[in-house]
Curated annotation (Swiss-Prot):
Highest taxon above the source species: Bacteria
Residues annotated as transmembrane: 11-31, 104-124, 139-159, 170-190, 229-249, 279-299
All residue ranges annotated as the ABC transmembrane type-1 domain in the record: 100-297
UniProt similarity note: Belongs to the binding-protein-dependent transport system permease family. OppBC subfamily.
Cellular compartment(s): Cell membrane
Task of the protein: Part of the ABC transporter complex NikABCDE (Opp2) involved in nickel import. Probably responsible for the translocation of the substrate across the membrane.
Protein name: Nickel import system permease protein NikB
A molecular function (GO) term: nickel cation transmembrane transporter activity
Organism: Staphylococcus aureus (strain MRSA252)
Topology term for the membrane: Multi-pass membrane protein
GO CC field: plasma membrane
Length: 328
């Protein structure tokens, strides 16, 4: 019962946040400089008649009150109608569908690559605590966090194009962007896996398994892997959301036709409907992904369910991730 209530609460919270994002996107359009009528007509106001201007305003609903305009905006949004681009005259929804796949592909590929690299390295760092491999992994993680993604991207692009003289579209528009975004994300996951595993290695469950004569591989797979990975799920939700924002810089650096590239191009041309669409896409994606991550954590983590079922024990059953910083 408590789980159902918690799921409903998170879903309602998601709807409220999406509503706020939609309203902010509407306000952004109204506060933006310039007149959309001028942009649509592609003419100076002095060169068009008053009838043309008024007809365009009526078509856009600009003569209505702000409240009525907001109501029409929300109604159109529910029907996936974001208007048309000032530049190409195409529906904004269709433009987003054309540009979104590459952004989503890069983001999810970055997530997979980061997990495949960081979980094994985090386990190695914890199992070889304070040894050379642990120190090397920690130094690399610190450098990855310290360096901005665009700086890493510039270095990789220089190495591949100038020093190695490799000219490949797949390399420059997929492999390098994924590698650039993965380095920073790997650092956080490695530190979290290492910290959680160091705590678990001292737990009674591990000690009991060793007393029963179980080998280290069995202990790692059956006793340590699940509780080590569970705290990563909320971090993945946050990281995947931030990856979408990070692609704004990376896509422009590597000239990738994704949402980030579209957003910057629309800002330059003051194509406000497309800007609205990009902001809504990024905002909706971040909120939905974080909600899914919260629900997965709730369903998979028994400690979360125990706390929901007995709120009085909330302070007595801390999550691993809450004390992980002391062992970092």
């Amino acid at each position: 019962m408590f789980i159902i209530k918690s799921i409903l609460y998170r879903l309602i919270q998601m709807i409220v946040v999406l509503f706020v994002i939609s309203t902010l996107a509407f306000i952004l359009m109204k506060l933006s400089p310039g007149n959309p009528v001028d942009k649509i007509l592609h003419l100076d106001v002095a060169q068009v008649s008053t009838e043309q201007i008024n007809a365009t305003k009526d078509k856009l609903g600009l003569n209505d009150s702000l409240l009525v305009q907001w109501w029409h905006w929300m109604n159109h949004l529910l029907h996936f109608n974001l208007g048309k681009s000032f530049e190409s005259k195409e529906p904004v929804t269709q433009i987003l569908f054309n540009y979104a796949p590459i952004t989503l592909l890069i983001s999810f590929s970055t997530l997979v690559v980061s997990l495949c690299i960081s979980i094994p390295l985090g386990i190695i760092a914890a199992k070889r605590f304070h040894k050379l491999s642990d120190k090397v992994i920690r130094v690399i993680s610190t450098l990855s966090i310290s360096l901005p993604a665009f700086f890493i991207g510039i270095i990789l692009l220089f190495i591949v194009t100038n020093l190695m003289n490799i000219d490949s579209v797949i390399l420059s528009q997929f492999i390098l962007p994924v590698l650039t975004l993965s380095l920073g994300m790997c650092a956080y996951i490695i530190r979290l896996v290492r910290s959680n595993l160091l705590i678990l290695l001292k737990s009674n469950i591990v000690q009991a398994s060793r007393l029963r004569g179980m080998n280290e591989r069995y202990i790692l797979i059956h006793d340590l892997l699940k509780p080590t990975i569970l705290p990563i799920i909320p971090l993945l939700g946050i990281s995947l959301g931030s990856l979408i924002g990070g692609t704004v810089v990376i896509e422009n650096l590597f000239d990738i036709p994704g949402i980030g590239y579209l957003l910057m191009d629309s800002i330059k041309s003051r194509d406000y409907p497309v800007i609205q669409g990009c902001v809504l896409f990024i905002g909706f994606f971040v909120v939905i992904i974080n909600t899914i991550a919260d629900l997965l954590t709730l369903l998979l983590d028994p400690k979360q369910r125990l706390q929901l079922g007995n709120p009085k024990n909330k302070t007595n059953t801390p999550l691993i991730s809450e004390s992980s910083d002391r062992h970092a």
